[in-house]
A protein has these predicted regions:
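Bacterial N-terminal signal peptides that target proteins for export
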Residues: 1-11
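Von Willebrand factor
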Residues: 31-141, 143-145, 177-180, 213-217
Length: 221
């Protein structure tokens, strides 16, 4: 009987040890969010930037300490850190985070007040710069927001016909306004979005379109 009891105790001890070891071996879950937002500044679309500013202010209200946020412009050659308007990783202290958000909002406001329209729209380059920034931020959830009509126009010589390594990045196209040609033939609009969806998914990302800006409540989930 004693031998039987000792065996039970030994087995229970081994099971408990195994559970403790397995619990210790699990890596902590990274709940931080990284958001990289691209603003189309080409042609008449620059007139839409006040809407983008409202979205940015909404996101600033939602993002938490240790989350990362960057806003960049889309112009003739967007694969460049020079196009980043402002970027930040929020401090762990709420009081510091509040001040960082205030500075961020002011930087964006200054940019929009003085923005100059770009003749070209290098969306792919902006996305690639966003992926690079998200890689460096090492956040748990990766989001690229593209405020644009999604009509890419590249300067002569720029090459963008390659797969972008989105690597589990969720890409959201916002406020995709319809061009005059889209109104004449709606298939152009649908085809344009389908091409972008295929490009994102080919690189291991996920794709979403939000045109009704009242539906932003789940954008960070």
């Amino acid at each position: 009987m004693r031998k039987f009891s000792f065996s039970i105790i030994l087995m229970a001890g081994l099971v408990l040890t195994g559970l403790l070891l397995s619990g210790c071996s699990k890596e902590p879950v990274n709940h931080t969010k990284g958001v990289y937002m691209l603003l189309d500044t080409s042609g008449t679309y620059a007139l839409e930037l006040k809407k983008a500013q409202n979205i940015i202010n909404y996101l600033l209200g939602k993002l938490q300490p240790l989350d990362s946020f960057a806003v960049a412009r889309i112009d003739s050659g967007s694969f460049s850190e020079k196009d980043i308007i402002h970027k930040v990783t929020f401090d762990s202290r709420p009081s510091m985070t509040t001040n960082q958000k205030r500075v961020f909002a002011q930087k964006v406001d200054d940019f929009i007040k003085g923005v100059k329209s770009s003749p070209y729209t290098d969306i792919s380059g902006g996305m690639l710069q966003g992926v690079e920034w998200l890689d460096e931020s090492k956040t748990g959830k990766r989001i690229i927001l593209v405020f644009s009509d999604m009509e890419e126009e590249l300067p002569e010589g720029h090459k963008r016909d390659f797969t972008i390594p989105f690597n589990n990045t969720h890409v959201v196209a916002l406020n995709v306004t319809k061009l005059r040609s889209d109104i004449v033939d709606p298939r152009e609009y649908m085809d344009r979005l389908s091409v972008w969806q295929a490009k994102v998914e080919a690189g291991g990302g996920s794709w979403e379109v939000i045109n009704d800006l009242d539906n932003l409540q789940d954008i960070l989930d």
